[in-house]
Amino acid sequence: MGYEIKLSRLTELGLFETDLYFTAAFNATEAMRVNRAVEVELINKRAEKARDIAAASSNFADSLFGTIRGGDCCVINGINVSMSFLYNLNYEDFINHARNYFDYLAHIIYLVYLRDKKKIDEIDFGKLIKNRSLIDNAEISDLISTIETNDLFTYISDYNNITKHNHGINTPINTNFRTFEMVGMVFPFSKEIKGVERTHDLALMRDKMKEIHQFVLDSQQAFLKEFDKIYTQEGNEK
C-alpha cells in the first residue's frame, strides 16, 4: 500500500473503529525503529566512555567509581544513570512494542473479518488464534497461522511474559579492551508452557532486534496487502 490509511475512508467502510489500532500499530513499528537507534547510540557512548577512561589519569578514572561502575555512568537531567540499565530497559521496551503490535493487529483483524461472526471481549492475538477458524478469508487465516508458528513470535511472547511477570533477563555488554569494540548480548532464557519448556539461546542483541523488527514489518505488509482489497474497492462498504 503506497498511501496513507485515512479515517474518512475507514468511516465510509464502516471501519472507523480500526483507525485507533492502525495508528497504534504504526507507532509500535516506529518505536521499534527508535529502540534500534538507541541501542546503537548507547553502545557508542559506552565505548567512548571506555576510551576516555583508558586515556585518562588514574585519578580521573577513580573519580568515576561510585554507586555505578566506572565507564557505565551517564548523566540525564543531572541524574547519574547506568548505561547498562538503560540498555536493558531499551530492549525490554523494544520487545514490548513488538508484542503490542500483534495485539493491535488482532484488534484490526477482529473488527474487519470476525466481528460479524462472534463477539469477543478484550481481544488480543491469543484470542484471535483460538478463533481463526471463524475467519472466511484464507489469506488472513494463513497469516495468523504463519505468525503463531514463527519462532520469533514465540521469542517475543516468552521474553515479554517473563520480564513482566517473573524477572529481568540479563543483557550484558561484552568489551574488547584492546579495540574497545562492544557487543550487546541477550542471555538465554526458558519459559514453561503446559509442561513443555521452551528455551531461547544466547543472542547478539543488535542482530535479534533487526530480525524481530523485520518480522513485524513483514507481517504488517502481508496484512496490508490483503486489507488493500477492501480499502480500495469502489463501493465496498461493510
State each model region's role.
Residues M1-N96, Y104-K238:
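Acidic, Ser/Thr/Gly/Pro-rich intrinsically disordered interaction regions
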